[in-house]
């Protein structure tokens, strides 16, 4: 049985562009109503999970508040069937003034062309002692 591809590199690039524009409305157009988002930090082994479109929107809004100048660069994207991966370098300044630069990736799952799961990972950057 051939799996129908519902993800594309072009879609992942468009999502990245919306993130870099900090355009929450445009970002959310890519997400299904029953989507989920796993952020890299949080109280559980998977970070912090947001379930449903409204909760995902709030989680992303919080990200933009905590990293108001966040930018994703050096991106590479690929897809297989309904899954996609985006690798990137995230830069930004935390609300407390601390500058952040980390490599990370997003694992994406799509259904009917919409994101149903975004799972984000960041490298842990440790300053030398």
Label the model's feature ranges:
Residues 1-33, 129:
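Short, low-complexity N-terminal intrinsically disordered segments enriched in polar/charged residues
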Residues 20, 50, 90:
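Short glycine/serine/threonine-biased micro-segments
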Residues 12, 41-45, 93:
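Residue-level detector of alpha-helix boundaries and kinks
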Residues 2-7, 57, 61-129:
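A beta-strand edge to alpha-helix "cap/lid" segment located at domain peripheries
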Residues 17-25, 34, 38, 69, ...:
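Acidic side chains
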Residues 26-81:
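A solvent-exposed, acidic/Ser-Thr-rich amphipathic alpha-helical stretch
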Residues 2-5, 17, 46, 50, ...:
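A generic helix-loop boundary/linker signal
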């Amino acid at each position: 049985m051939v799996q129908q591809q519902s993800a594309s590199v072009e879609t992942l690039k468009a999502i990245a562009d919306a993130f870099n524009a900090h355009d929450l409305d445009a970002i959310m157009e890519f997400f299904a109503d029953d989507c989920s988002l796993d952020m890299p930090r949080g109280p559980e082994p998977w970070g912090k999970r947001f379930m449903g479109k409204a909760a995902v929107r709030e989680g992303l809004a919080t990200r933009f508040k905590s990293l108001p100048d966040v930018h994703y660069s050096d991106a590479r994207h690929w897809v297989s069937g309904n899954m996609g991966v985006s690798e990137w370098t995230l830069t930004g300044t935390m609300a407390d003034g601390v500058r952040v630069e980390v490599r990370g990736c997003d694992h994406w799952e799509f259904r009917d062309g919409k994101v149903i799961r975004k799972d984000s990972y960041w490298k842990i950057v440790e300053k030398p002692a």
